[in-house]
């Protein structure tokens, strides 16, 4: 409950969105609020290498978090993701991608496709 209350405060007072949203504790716990928070490694953001980009952006070691060579966060309870405030934002699943999609993604990320294969193995079509 304390964490949920803190979340509401940040969303309304710091990030300045959903200012008039009034939710019950049950709605908060069910995540019935405006926006989404896809976490790295989950279905809508399966590429764990994104963790390395976020580390460069926010310098995780300043708060005692480091990444393993595979992108796993330590301590284990750590999590990182993206915040989208738009009221129409919805979770989705990336699903399986083919070789052409992998090559396009690798090109746009400027990363070798073989490196991305490691991070997206579960999402690659056979």
Mark where each language-model region is:
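Small-residue-enriched alpha-helical segments and adjacent helix-cap loops
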Residues: 11-89, 100, 119
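Charged substrate- and nucleic-acid-binding regions of tRNA-handling and nucleotidyl-transfer enzymes
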Residues: 79, 83-126
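Single conserved hydrophobic/aromatic residue that forms the stacking wall/gate
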Residues: 1-9
């Amino acid at each position: 409950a304390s964490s949920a209350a803190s979340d509401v405060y940040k969303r309304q007072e710091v990030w300045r969105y959903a200012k008039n949203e009034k939710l019950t504790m049950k709605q908060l716990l069910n995540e019935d609020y405006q926006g989404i928070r896809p976490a790295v490694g989950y279905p809508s953001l399966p590429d764990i290498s994104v963790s390395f980009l976020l580390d460069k952006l926010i310098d995780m070691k300043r708060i005692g978090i480091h990444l393993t060579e595979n992108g796993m966060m330590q301590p284990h309870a750590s999590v990182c993701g993206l915040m989208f405030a738009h009221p129409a934002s919805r979770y989705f699943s990336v699903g399986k991608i083919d070789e052409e999609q992998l090559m396009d993604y690798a090109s746009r990320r400027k990363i070798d496709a073989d490196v991305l294969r490691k991070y997206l193995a579960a999402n690659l079509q056979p």
